[in-house]
C-alpha cells in the first residue's frame, strides 16, 4: 500500500471525507486502471452527499472493470438514491449475475420494486436476503415495511419485532411495530412500542403523533390531545402536524371531549395565529367564527400534505362523490352518444373525475384546476387532462377566456361557505346551455344557509342552494340527497346537483 493510499484510508476512517477524496482522486489520476480507487472516490462523494458525482465514479469503475462487484452494487444504490430506478434495477441485476447472493444487490432491487409499489416483487428480494443471512436487520425491517403496505399487519408485526430484537435502539423498528399493533387492534402493545421509541428519541414529533393515535383508540382523550400537542410543538409547528392536530381536535369534539378541545384550540390559536390551518380549524373548534370561505392557504396546505395517499384514504371512507357525478352525467347525456364539450374539472384533485370526464371532452378539451400543486402532480400522472392549472377556482373562472360546456366539482364547495361569488363566476364561465354538476355537504344541524362545521368544512342547506342557483340565472335540472362518504363512525350526507345556464 502506498503512503498516499494509506493517507486516503485514514482520512476516510476518521470521517475526513474531503481530504480523503483529494487523495483518492490523485491516486485515480495516477493509476487510471484501478477500479478500486474510482470506487473509493465515489464513496467519498457519497459521504459528502453528492450522490450524482458518486454515481459517476462508480460508473467509471464499472467501465474499467466489468466484474467489479463493489462498483456495480454501489452504482446500483447510487442510481436508486438519485431516483433513476431503471438504472438501479439494471445494475442490481448485473451485480446478481456476478454474485447471486449479493445482499446489497438483493436489498437494492427490493427497494426499487418497493418504490414502484410492486410490493410482491419487493418481498421476493427481501426474503432472499433474509434467507441468505438470518438475523439481517435490513432485510427484517424492509419485510416489515412491505407487509405493512400490503396490509398484512400480523406479518408486519412479526418482522418489526424481529428487527427490534436485532437492534433495540431502532426507532423505526419500534414505531413500525407500534403501527402494526394499532392496525391489529392491540392498543396497549402499540402504546408500549411507541413509548420505547420515545425513550430512544424524545425529539421525534412523529412518535408523539403515533402515541396520540394509540391513546385516541383507547378513548383516552386527555393523553391523546397532550401527545398530539407535543407533536406540534416538537415539530416547530410543521404543517403536517398542524393538520393532524386539527383532525384530532375535531374527533375529540365528536366524542364530547369539548372542555379539553376548547382549551387546546385556544392555546393553538394563541401560539400559531398566522398559520392558515390553525386559524381556520382553531376558530371552527373554539368559537365558530369563520370567514365566508376557507383560507386558500388552508386548503392548499391540507391537500399538499395528503396528496400522495389521498386516494387510499378516500377508499377507506367509501367516498362516493365521483361515482355520483358520473351517474348524473349518464342520466343527462346518456350511456353511448353524448356531446363533446370543453370541460373544467373544478378542484380536480388527483383526477378521480377526470378519468371518466375524458370521454365527454372535445379534442384537447379537458382542463383541471386546483389550489394544491401536490394534487395536480398526482392528476398529471393519470394523463387524462389537456391542461392543469394551479389556482383558486373562483379566480380562475372569473378570468378565463374560454367558455365551458360543462363544469364538474366533486366535494370542493364544502370549503366555501357563501357560494354567491362562485355561482356568479360559474355562470360567467359557461356557454349558453352549459351545465355545472357538483356536490355539497348537507346542513341538517341548524337553519343557517351555510355554516362552518367543527370539521373545518362548510355545510349548506338545500333551500339555499336552490335559491342561489335561480337568483344567479341557472335552471335547476336535478338535485338528489345522497350519502357522500363516511367520517369516523358517522355518515356524511349531501346533495348532488345539476344546473343549466339559461339566457344568452
Annotated model-derived regions:
Residues 13, 47, 81-82, 115, ...:
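Register position in tetratricopeptide repeats
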Residues 438-458:
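Short, glycine-/aromatic-enriched active-site segment of Class I SAM-dependent methyltransferases
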Residues 344, 349-396:
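Class I SAM-dependent methyltransferase SAM/SAH-binding core
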Residues 420-432:
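A short glycine-rich, Lys/Arg-flanked "PGG" loop and its adjoining helix->strand segment in the class I
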Residues 398-407:
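A short acidic, Gly/Pro-enriched loop at the edge of an enzyme's catalytic core
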